[in-house]
């Protein structure tokens, strides 16, 4: 569960970076913006789920 928590923290940092970090590299900013257009931050945490099911959710688009 620790790895999932760290992954969640990274995604939170990316999501806040959308408005918070304007000094970031332009290429990275465009990449982040492109990812933002896909609303894949809707996270459903299922207790007792396997690592494979929790690690693949962020590839799905809303």
UniProtKB/Swiss-Prot annotation:
It comes from the Viruses. Belongs to the orthopoxviruses A37.5 protein family. This is Uncharacterized protein A37.5. It comes from Vaccinia virus (strain Western Reserve). The lineage of its organism: Viruses, Varidnaviria, Bamfordvirae, Nucleocytoviricota, Pokkesviricetes.
């Amino acid at each position: 569960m620790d790895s999932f928590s760290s992954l969640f923290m990274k995604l939170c940092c990316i999501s806040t970076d959308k408005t918070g970090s304007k000094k970031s590299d332009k290429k990275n900013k465009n990449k982040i913006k492109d990812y933002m257009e896909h609303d894949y931050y809707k996270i459903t945490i299922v207790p007792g789920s396997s690592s494979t099911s929790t690690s693949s959710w962020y590839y799905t688009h809303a």
